[in-house]
C-alpha cells in the first residue's frame, strides 16, 4: 500500500499480487487498481487484464516445428497455471501441425524471474536434445545459454535479440502501453469502470519482434499469414 499512501490514483500490478491487490483495494476505495493476469475482482475498484499470449506461442510453435532438427523443443515454464499451460499447449499443437514428430520437454522453475534457475533449466533441456528453447519466464538467461550452445531460442515479453543475436528467431512482445494509457485517462476523467480485458494480436497487446533472417523468407511469410489469421 506504499503507492496509494503516496496519493497515486491508479495502480497497476503484475503477476503474483492478486490477493494483496484486492486486500489493499478494500482499504482505498477511491483508488483504481489494475491487476495483470489475475481473475479476482473482489471490489468495484479492481479490474483485471491479460493478453492472449497463446496466440504468440502458436506462431512460435509454427517456427519451431519448421526450424528444429532434433524434433525436441525445450520449454522453461514458470508456474503450472492456466496462462502457462495454455501457452505450452498452443505452441506444441502448432509445432506438431507442421511437424508431427515434435516432442516438447518442460522444466518447471516455479518463478517468473531467476536467471540462475532459468540458465540451469535451459542447459538441462539442451542436454536432453532440445535444439529450440522457449521460455515463459522473464530473464534473458535462457536465450544466452542457447546462444552459447548454438541452438535456436525465442525471447519473452520484450525484444531480447541483442542478448542472443544468432540464436533468437524472434521474441513475443507484451505491449501493455496502450491499455495503460487508456485506463489511466479513464481514471482521470471519471469514466473508469471495473472490467476484465483479454486482448491479443488483433489489439496489439501481443506482438512479434523482427524475425531472424536465418528463418528464410518463405517461413517468415507463413508466420505473417498465420498472424493475420489469428488476428482476424
Predicted regions and their residues:
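Hydrophobic alpha-helical segments within soluble ligand-binding/sensing domains
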Residues: 49-71, 172-191
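Hinge/beta->alpha junction and helix N-cap segments in small-molecule ligand-binding domains
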Residues: 38, 51-58, 78-88, 106-116, ...
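Hydrophobic alpha-helical
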Residues: 15-23, 118-156, 166, 177-178
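Structured C-terminal subdomain patch of bacterial secreted/periplasmic proteins
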Residues: 169-232
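Single conserved hydrophobic/aromatic residue that forms the stacking wall/gate
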Residues: 1-8, 12
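Structural motif
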Residues: 5-6, 110-126
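An alpha-beta-alpha
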Residues: 57-102, 106, 196-216
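Flexible loop/hinge segments that line or gate small-molecule binding clefts
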Residues: 26-51, 158-167
Amino acid at each position: 500500500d506504499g503507492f496509494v499512501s503516496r496519493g497515486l490514483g491508479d495502480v497497476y500490478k503484475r503477476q503474483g499480487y492478486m490477493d494483496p491487490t484486492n486486500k489493499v483495494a478494500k482499504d482505498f476505495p477511491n483508488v483504481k487498481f489494475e491487476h495483470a493476469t489475475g481473475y479476482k475482482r473482489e471490489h468495484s475498484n479492481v479490474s483485471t487484464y491479460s493478453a492472449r499470449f497463446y496466440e504468440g506461442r502458436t506462431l512460435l510453435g509454427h517456427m519451431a516445428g519448421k526450424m528444429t532438427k532434433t524434433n525436441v523443443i525445450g520449454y522453461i515454464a514458470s508456474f503450472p497455471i492456466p496462462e502457462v499451460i495454455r501457452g505450452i499447449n498452443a505452441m506444441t499443437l502448432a509445432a506438431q501441425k507442421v511437424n508431427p514428430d515434435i516432442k516438447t520437454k518442460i522444466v518447471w522453475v516455479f518463478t517468473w524471474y531467476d536467471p540462475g534457475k532459468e540458465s540451469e533449466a535451459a542447459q538441462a533441456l539442451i542436454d536432453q536434445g532440445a535444439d529450440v528453447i522457449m521460455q515463459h519466464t522473464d530473464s534473458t538467461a535462457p536465450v544466452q545459454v542457447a546462444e552459447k550452445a548454438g541452438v535456436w531460442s525465442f525471447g519473452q515479453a520484450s525484444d531480447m535479440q541483442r542478448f542472443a543475436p544468432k540464436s533468437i528467431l524472434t521474441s513475443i512482445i507484451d505491449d501493455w502501453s496502450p491499455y495503460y494509457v487508456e485506463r489511466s485517462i479513464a481514471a482521470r476523467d471519471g469514466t473508469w469502470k471495473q472490467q476484465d480485458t483479454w486482448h491479443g494480436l488483433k489489439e496489439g497487446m501481443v506482438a512479434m519482434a523482427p524475425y531472424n533472417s536465418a528463418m528464410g523468407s518463405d517461413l517468415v511469410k507463413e508466420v505473417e499469414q498465420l498472424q493475420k489469421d489469428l488476428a482476424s
